[in-house]
């Protein structure tokens, strides 16, 4: 579908979308969202309940799927991580924005996560090297203290510096009219990332700071905002999330559909948000999704061995999935 039509044409031509059981229809939380961002959310809503949009993290792994399975995933997952100032200071370089623009040129969907290196206080030891700097154990940065500095503290200003650095990259995408599924501050309740290390309150405050800085200060509106928790204590709220997601890494060979998490997230969102799997190891079996009525809108396989080792997702299974008429790929023509 995306190989044939632009996002804007999808917004205005529901007939081109093929069969669809539209179960949810709501506008973007950002009332100033660009036409492209509105079209992207609308497209996902139109597929929700009848199709499952395929995704693959990392351009190398995306290319692997296209080469070895013969079908290209609809969504490319990329990471803003090496645009973080702390990473740049250690020589980090990134071509993520270039990858995103290229994928948009294929009429693909782009999803961006941000493994945010702590703004300062990376331990940078043999045990905890700088490149682990988004992990709680690898930094002494305290998010609770930073967000409660009331705009005057050094660490608060460093948070803004980092957000500004990512906003500069989002602006490049905005100028290219590229909408993105933006999933910042992911997996907060795990506590293994510094933004979730001090509990829900500072995490939620940081979410608000980030959203305000990007949309109001930088006037950027080309994002569909993706939250990433099924824990009600950590969920920012439907007024702050366009799509609600989980990350799901079951045992090797388990292609179940995480029905318990789906139901939990339905409750958390009051059945008012599209639900998706922002990261997976083994892909949920589309037959099981349909049979159990667990309608994750999309799934994004993590990179490297998760897609390439032949164990997490055996090639025979991948061929089955990508040739299923319910699975949306880049060259999907509709069921």
Curated annotation (Swiss-Prot):
Which GO CC terms are listed, alphabetically? extracellular region
Q: Which residues are glycosylated?
A: 21, 142, 152, 323
Transmembrane parts of this sequence:
none
Q: What class of enzyme is it?
A: hydrolase
What residues form the catalytic site here?
187 (proton donor), 279 (nucleophile)
The GH26 domain extends over: 32-331
* N-terminal signal peptide: 1-18
Here the disulfide bonds are none
Which Gene3D superfamilies does UniProt cross-reference here?
Glycosidases
Q: Which GO terms describe its biological process?
A: substituted mannan metabolic process
Give residues annotated as binding substrate. 192, 249
Q: Which InterPro entries match?
A: GH26_dom (IPR022790), Glyco_hydro_26 (IPR000805), Glycoside_hydrolase_SF (IPR017853), Rhodanese-like_dom (IPR001763)
Is Signal one of the keywords?
yes
State its location(s): Secreted
Task: Write down a Pfam family by its short name.
Answer: Glyco_hydro_26
Catalysed reaction per UniProt? Random hydrolysis of (1->4)-beta-D-mannosidic linkages in mannans, galactomannans and glucomannans
Fetch the PANTHER family from UniProt: GH26 DOMAIN-CONTAINING PROTEIN-RELATED, MANNAN ENDO-1,4-BETA-MANNOSIDASE E-RELATED
Family from the record: Belongs to the glycosyl hydrolase 26 family.
Q: What is this protein called?
A: Mannan endo-1,4-beta-mannosidase man26A
Q: What is the lineage of its organism?
A: Eukaryota, Fungi, Dikarya, Ascomycota, Pezizomycotina
């Amino acid at each position: 579908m995306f190989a044939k039509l632009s996002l804007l044409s999808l917004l205005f031509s529901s007939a081109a979308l093929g069969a669809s059981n539209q179960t949810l229809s709501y506008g973007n939380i950002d009332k100033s969202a660009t036409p492209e961002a509105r079209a992207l959310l609308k497209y996902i809503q139109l597929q929700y309940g009848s199709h499952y949009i395929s995704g693959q993290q990392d351009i190398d792994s995306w290319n692997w799927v296209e080469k070895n399975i013969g079908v290209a995933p609809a969504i490319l997952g990329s990471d803003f991580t090496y645009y973080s100032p702390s990473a740049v200071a250690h020589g980090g370089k990134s071509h993520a924005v270039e990858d995103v623009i290229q994928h948009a040129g294929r009429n693909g969907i782009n999803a961006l996560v941000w493994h945010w290196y702590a703004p300062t206080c990376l331990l940078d030891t043999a045990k905890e090297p700088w490149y682990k700097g988004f992990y709680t154990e690898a930094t002494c940065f305290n998010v609770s203290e930073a967000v409660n500095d009331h705009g005057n503290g050094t660490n608060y200003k460093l948070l803004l510096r980092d957000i500004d650095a990512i906003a500069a990259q989002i602006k490049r995408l905005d100028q290219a009219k590229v909408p993105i599924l933006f999933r910042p501050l992911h997996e907060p309740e795990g506590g293994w990332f510094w933004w979730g290390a001090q509990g829900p309150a500072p995490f939620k405050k940081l979410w608000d700071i980030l959203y305000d800085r990007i949309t109001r200060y930088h006037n950027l509106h080309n994002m569909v905002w993706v939250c990433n928790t099924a824990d009600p204590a950590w969920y920012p709220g439907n007024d702050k999330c366009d799509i609600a997601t989980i990350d799901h890494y079951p045992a090797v060979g388990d292609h179940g559909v995480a029905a318990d998490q789906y139901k939990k997230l339905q409750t958390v969102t009051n059945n008012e948000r599209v639900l998706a799997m922002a990261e997976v190891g083994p892909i949920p079996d589309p037959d099981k999704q349909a049979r159990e009525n667990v309608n994750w809108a999309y799934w994004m396989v993590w990179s490297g061995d998760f897609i390439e080792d032949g164990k997490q997702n055996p090639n025979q299974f991948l061929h089955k999935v990508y040739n299923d008429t319910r699975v949306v790929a880049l060259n999907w023509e509709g069921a």
